[in-house]
C-alpha cells in the first residue's frame, strides 16, 4: 500500500492535535479538616465548668483539654459531650458508683476519663453538625450543676 504525501501529512497532523489537546488539571486535593484546640476546667472546688460555653466549626478536629481545677476536695470530674436532648438520659445510664460512661453509647459523642484534682487530660474528636450540644460531668450528682454547651457553627 502506497501512502500519499497528503495522507501522511494528515495522519501526522491528527496525531499532533491529539497530543496537544487541552488537558484538565488534576482535581485539587481535599482540604484537611481544621484543628481547633479548646480548654475547659472544673472551677476550683465548685461544681461548675469554666467556661460553660465552648464554640467550634462543624467538621473540625477538636482537641479538648480538660483540667480538674480542684485543690482541696477529692471529688473526681470528667467531661461528657452528648447529642442534644440526651444529657439527662445519659447521666441516668452511667455506672453511678464511678460515673463511668459507656464508649458504645450512641448518644455520647466524646468524653474524658475521670480526673483527680490537679490532673489534665486531652481528647480528640470530630465536631458534629451545627447545633448546641450539651456537656456535663458524670460523677454522681454533679451533672445538674456541672454542665454547659458546645456550640457548633458552620464557620468561625
Name every feature range the model reports, one short phrase each:
Residues 7-22:
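N-terminal export signals
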Residues 20-43, 85-101, 126, 140-156:
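Extracytoplasmic/periplasmic copper-protein system
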Residues 33-59:
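N-terminal edge beta-strand
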Residues 45-50, 72-77, 88-90:
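Short, solvent-exposed loop/turn elements at domain surfaces
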Residues 46, 99-109:
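Short beta-strand and strand-turn-strand segments in soluble, beta-rich domains
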Residues 66-68:
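Asparagine-centered strand-capping/turn motif at beta-strand->loop junctions
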Residues 71, 106-156:
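Extracellular/periplasmic metallocenter environments
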Residues 78-82:
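Beta-strand signatures of extracellular beta-sandwich domains
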Amino acid at each position: 500500500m502506497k501512502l500519499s504525501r497528503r495522507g501522511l501529512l494528515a495522519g501526522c497532523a491528527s496525531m499532533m492535535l491529539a497530543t496537544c489537546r487541552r488537558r484538565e488539571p488534576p482535581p485539587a486535593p481535599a482540604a484537611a479538616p481544621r484543628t481547633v484546640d479548646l480548654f475547659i476546667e472544673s472551677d476550683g472546688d465548685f461544681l461548675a465548668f469554666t467556661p460553660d460555653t465552648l464554640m467550634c466549626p462543624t467538621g473540625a478536629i477538636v482537641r479538648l483539654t480538660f483540667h480538674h481545677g480542684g485543690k482541696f476536695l477529692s471529688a473526681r470530674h470528667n467531661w461528657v459531650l452528648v447529642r442534644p436532648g440526651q444529657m439527662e438520659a445519659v447521666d441516668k445510664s452511667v455506672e453511678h458508683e464511678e460515673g463511668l460512661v459507656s464508649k458504645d453509647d450512641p448518644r455520647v459523642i466524646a468524653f474524658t476519663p475521670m480526673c483527680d484534682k490537679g490532673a489534665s487530660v486531652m481528647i480528640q474528636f470530630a465536631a458534629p453538625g451545627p447545633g448546641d450540644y450539651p456537656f456535663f460531668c458524670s460523677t454522681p450528682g454533679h451533672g445538674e450543676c456541672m454542665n454547659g454547651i458546645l456550640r457548633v457553627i458552620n464557620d468561625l
